[in-house]
């Protein structure tokens, strides 16, 4: 088993950014406006979603978000992890 100490902050940030880029790309490919997706997810803030999607202010999607987005956009959840 690998030690968690090998996962530095930069690698973790790249992980989150890759997921964010994939979420945004897939959402746009599906022609789904941010507001519609946010409402269908049951979120109360498009600002929060936008920050997650653009990796701003240390905001990122959690597993529940990724799961809901995959269902709403009708994509396999693994699509969000491509490039990692």
Predicted features, each with a name:
Residues 73-84:
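Short C-terminal boundary/hinge segments that cap the last helix of small helical domains
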Residues 31-52:
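Short alpha-helical DNA-recognition segment
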Residues 24, 35, 67, 78:
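Residues within the helices of the helix-turn-helix
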């Amino acid at each position: 088993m690998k030690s968690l100490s090998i996962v530095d902050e930069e690698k973790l940030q790249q992980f989150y950014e890759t997921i964010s880029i994939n979420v945004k790309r897939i959402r746009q490919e599906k022609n789904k406006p941010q507001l519609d997706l946010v409402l269908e997810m049951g979120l109360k803030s498009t600002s929060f979603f936008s920050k997650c999607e653009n990796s701003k202010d240390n905001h990122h999607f959690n597993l529940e978000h990724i799961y809901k987005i995959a269902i709403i956009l009708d994509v396999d959840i693994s699509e969000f992890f491509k490039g990692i």
